[in-house]
């Protein structure tokens, strides 16, 4: 190793015995074309990760990009419900085809493959991880600008499989305002660093609720700690999303695409910058 080594192998052309091996990702379906893969993660469940994935895909679709959502939360899939998709994904000699939403967003989820969407998926970790991998290798993601991967919470088999198998270009961490978020976000950030996957920033969900009478912001979960957590990890806060009963109503009705909130524009900007690099 040279004394001048910066330990940044990505920007070095030297033939060095200390060079990190290039990641060996699984090849996508031969008929797929995906420009950027964005992972949406959370350290715990119930923070609105799937809703963030859906709204971010909608925000990018409104900007004219063709988006897809790979629902990697095999045991708790909710993406089809948010978009009002209840059909069965079809397959041919080219592969399995995602179902398109009203806005043209490609969606693939385990709920689009089972006979009854209410049937539980009682699989062990390796089988679940294998299914997620097949959503990349067997599904035809045709001319997709941004593929958002809605991951299950935590740092278990599925996130590890996604980071190892898919060429993830960036990660968005979804968190809530509680102080506990510091430890939870740290776990997600540390895993991303271990897997050498770049972090785009943090989205704080359920940040506040707007009083319908006076318009003031009410911090339902107390004062937010996301700014200090983001500063600690040198990450930007991409958005602070409110609790909005209208969003919950539209999500339950499968009409999330009609929601007009613009609070994820900062996160959309971060994704768009990846495409322009």
PLM regions and their residue ranges:
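Walker A/P-loop phosphate-binding motif and the immediately C-terminal alpha-helix
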Residues: 31, 36-74, 189
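Short glycine/serine/threonine-rich phosphate/pyrophosphate-binding segments
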Residues: 49-54, 77-80, 151-159, 180-184
């Amino acid at each position: 190793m040279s004394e001048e080594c910066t330990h940044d192998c990505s920007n070095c052309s030297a033939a060095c015995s200390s060079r990190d091996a290039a990641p060996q990702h699984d090849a996508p379906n031969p008929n797929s074309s995906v420009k950027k893969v964005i992972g949406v993660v959370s350290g715990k469940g119930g923070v609105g990760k799937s809703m963030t994935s859906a709204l971010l895909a909608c925000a990018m679709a409104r900007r004219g990009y063709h988006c897809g959502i790979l629902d990697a939360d095999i045991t708790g899939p909710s993406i089809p419900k948010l978009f009002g998709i209840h059909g069965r994904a079809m397959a041919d000699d080219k592969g399995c085809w995602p179902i398109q939403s009203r806005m043209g967003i490609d969606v693939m989820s385990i709920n689009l493959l089972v006979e009854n969407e209410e049937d539980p998926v009682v699989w062990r970790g390796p089988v679940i991880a294998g299914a997620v991998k097949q959503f990349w290798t067997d599904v035809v993601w045709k001319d997709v600008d941004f593929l958002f991967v809605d991951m299950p919470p935590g740092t278990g088999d599925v996130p590890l499989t996604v980071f190892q198998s898919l060429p993830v270009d960036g990660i968005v961490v979804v968190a809530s305002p509680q102080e506990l978020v510091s430890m939870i976000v740290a776990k997600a950030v540390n895993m991303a660093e271990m897997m050498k996957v770049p972090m785009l920033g943090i989205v704080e969900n359920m940040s506040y609720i707007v009083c319908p009478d006076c318009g003031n912001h009410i911090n339902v979960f107390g004062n937010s700690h996301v700014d200090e957590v983001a500063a600690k990890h040198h990450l930007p806060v991409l958005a602070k999303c409110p609790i909005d009963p209208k969003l919950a109503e539209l999500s339950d009705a499968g009409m999330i695409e009609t929601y007009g909130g613009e609070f994820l524009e900062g996160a959309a900007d971060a994704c768009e910058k990846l495409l322009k690099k």
